[in-house]
Amino acid sequence: MSSGIVGWGAYVPRYRLNVLEIAKLWGYDEGVVKSLGLMEKAVPSHDEDSTTMAWEAARNALMRAKIDPSEIKAVLFGSESKVYAVKPTSTIIIDSLGISHETLSADLEFACRAASVGLRLLSGMVEANRIKYGLVIGSDVAQSNPGDVLELSSAAASVAYIVGPADESSAIIEYATSYTTDMPDFWRRDGMPYPLHGEAFTGEPAYFAHIISAVQLLLKEGGYSISDFDYFVFHQPNGKFPLQVAKKLGVPLEKVKEGLVSPYIGNPYNASALLGLAKVLDIAKPGQRILVAPFGSGAGSDAFSILVTDKIEERQKLAPRVEDYINNKKVISYSVYAKTTNKYKVYE
């Protein structure tokens, strides 16, 4: 049995923070912002977190899938910013959406790639006929130390996919590959409030090497060429890297631009590349093929070949599009952002 994406959904908080304002506050040159290709980043309201956003995205995915939540038999949640250090978010999603208690669930961790791994796992479970439908969610309120360059891009958003049989799918998962190494490019030890990053490792040895390796493996094993794909979506830590990796792979930039989200909302970690995929699915036509390659620090990358079916056009209209969320925004000041996200602790 083949598997595919039956339904997809997204959620992006309404609040936006101007990236240039952050840069000026901490003394960064305007050229730094320009070089990153970022304009604004999405940030949560005081009552939003990775769990509430996950529920929003999953509800949208259910609307598109048009299935009863009780039919879902596996729920996987990928995040770097879980509300609880020890308590799964996937169980909260199960009860809040009316999913059966007779369901496999787990929270996954692999930096920005955990949800992508979940997508591969659910695809395999469906293909092995162990489940009919599974739900995977990538949701993050991305963490960054105030004043660190990461604060220019770290953002909040969520994306969800319901995986099921190919004959019911909006898009078929044709093939997938993975590439993984031990790479110290980004980490957060237990008890640390914010992650650290080894800047010498974040570019060529980590992001570019892993994505290129996963994509080249997909092309080789699947028998594809670059020209077989209509859209390419890469992990988006900023607006510059996905364009650079496209150039290295010989991908025309016009095949990348529709999947870009980071210039408008920043990098929402687990919802980065998969949110770009959702943005493409919102507009894709039957017969078009998409290559999506998420990346997670530590480090690893997956590459998927996804073929759009004739069921997609009906489902595109059933829930808000990623573009709708991008355009529905309210710009706030850094001080409001710092207050609503508890950036600074008050000790009495």
UniProtKB/Swiss-Prot annotation:
It comes from the Archaea. This is Hydroxymethylglutaryl-CoA synthase. InterPro entries: ACP_syn_III_C, HMG_CoA_Synthase, Thiolase-like. The active site is at 80 (proton donor/acceptor), 112 (acyl-thioester intermediate), 235 (proton donor/acceptor). Pathway: Metabolic intermediate biosynthesis; (R)-mevalonate biosynthesis; (R)-mevalonate from acetyl-CoA: step 2/3. The lineage of its organism: Archaea, Thermoproteota, Thermoprotei, Sulfolobales, Sulfolobaceae. Disulfide bonds: none annotated. (3S)-3-hydroxy-3-methylglutaryl-CoA binds at residues 29, 112, 153, 202, 235, 267, 297. Keywords: Acyltransferase, Isoprene biosynthesis, Transferase.
